[in-house]
């Protein structure tokens, strides 16, 4: 679905699976990933399942790939030249766990690092929710306006973004929060 959406908007998409069947396949996958990063303007990390979808299972796997010396160097160069990175589902979770979000570079996780945690319902949630755009300080938000409300699908078990009050204030003040959940009357809500 994501590849089709990018293609619909005129992007040339290269799907790059990471093969782990043996050590040789992993080495080839790293090299192919690096070659694609070097020749890309956008990197998109999709979601997926691994390890019986244990808590952040695929995200931990993706982070290990991102921390590979060659991949990390390629991503650092990619960021320096202004490349765009986005992730959904476990791909987003991996960006948070690696520090690429919200810091824009690799950061070691600490006890106060932002993270994704179990929903308040403590179970998988799949439904439509409403969000309001509160900031358009990103190329990803071209064509939307502050105040726009969008109905979007969510499907997650670990969809709660947890951050300290100080970090929240920093993200807000830096213009890094671009939407908030709202109820059907457009009022801010913690119900995701």
Task: Name each model feature, range by range.
Residues 1-88, 92-105, 111, 117-125, ...:
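N-terminal beta1-alpha1 cap of cysteine-dependent amidohydrolase-like domains
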